[in-house]
């Protein structure tokens, strides 16, 4: 459910982006609805609405949601201010690499890697498995960031489709692979430090 809520602004961005640009007037202001810039405005507005509603309901946002919202406001705002989609193309790579940095930093800060802090309440695994899983997430975020950057600046007509559905597809595949891997270790003795091959 949480993943679906996080996906709403991106889906609205995609829908508006795919519309043929058409002139509109609201309260005496003329603008073009459809295309990259109105889609960016929709992304900003819908992100504020979605995360604002979550904050009012839960009295908090997760760190990843704060990062996503701030990146949306910064890169989306720069895109609209300078009328250049280049800024928006950097959003997904930067967010993914910041996530990778956060997961990597947890190996040196605190007594548990980040993935264990996130999932440790639901799963009991040896520390070696948590470490390996955390490294997998670091690699995943680095790859997603690089893939988004490559597609955004190489395939101009395809990058929005990839941003929405390519990233989602990679995430689903990774989560399935993680589930298969974890299923092999769910009954491991947590005191054991050596993972299965």
Curated annotation (Swiss-Prot):
It comes from Pseudomonas putida (strain ATCC 47054 / DSM 6125 / CFBP 8728 / NCIMB 11950 / KT2440). It is a multi-pass membrane protein. One of its GO terms (cellular component) is plasma membrane. Its main location: membrane. Plays a role in cell envelope biogenesis, maintenance of cell envelope integrity and membrane homeostasis. Keywords: Cell inner membrane, Cell membrane, Membrane, Transmembrane, Transmembrane helix. The chain crosses the membrane at residues 36-56, 64-84, 90-110, 135-155, 162-182. The lineage of its organism: Bacteria, Pseudomonadati, Pseudomonadota, Gammaproteobacteria, Pseudomonadales. Pfam families: IspA. It is found in: Cell inner membrane. Belongs to the YciB family. It comes from the Bacteria. The keyword Transmembrane applies. This is Inner membrane-spanning protein YciB.
